Amino acid sequence: MEGLTFANGASWNLHMIYSDQIATDHCTIRSDGVWNGDGWDPDSATNCTLFACEFFTGDDAVAIKSGKNPEGNLINRPTKHIRVFDCHSGFGHGICIGSEMSGGVEDVKIWDCDMAMSTSGLEVKATKKRGGYVRNVEVRDCTLSHVMVHAVGYNDDGIGAPVPPVLEDFRYERVTLLGRYIDHDHVWHTCPAIELKGFDLPSHEVRNIHFKDVVLEDNRGPEQNILMQDCLNVSFENVTVRPGVQPG
């Protein structure tokens, strides 16, 4: 899919399920005002590449998925080998992995993206019932409103998996995190630049996360720029904190 404009689908605009070798480039996706209006959603799909695209979405610009419990656990078809680069959010929720990730997600690489104008920046989210895993995610050379890797309590319906999800092995390098986000009414708010929150069970912490050459904008004070709970093996290397810009 090249050079196309997709607009105002009833829900997700591009949904690639059980697919392989899908490339999308130089497209514009618009769904501002559409509830659950995701842009580009690989779902139990492999070897999908997205680049040089512009997003104005009512929900996630990109949502990487692999099925929802219990069907996703039973089918057990992971999403892997996803590449996203040179993409820009004009409005929307940014890039997300989950929360429908019951079949597992692995080997995701994201670079040269601008998700400053977004609600969630770059978010990895899972509920306790989902099961599955997200692992081996690399992000570099991006500007993001903020970063979240966290357990969430909403959309926690359906028969639960035997064990909670595993969230592990993330690397963020040369990223700028603004510590502020824009909501659905186009109003800016401050927020932690980094939020890491695992599940409160042994072996289900968020683990093995490395930040290197990161710039944080200080909008909330030093004790609120980074929030961590139920985490294991988190490291920071060469982090620069600069004065933030208060939302107007």
Pin down the residues of each PLM region:
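Extracellular/periplasmic carbohydrate-active domains that bind, remodel
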Residues: 1-248
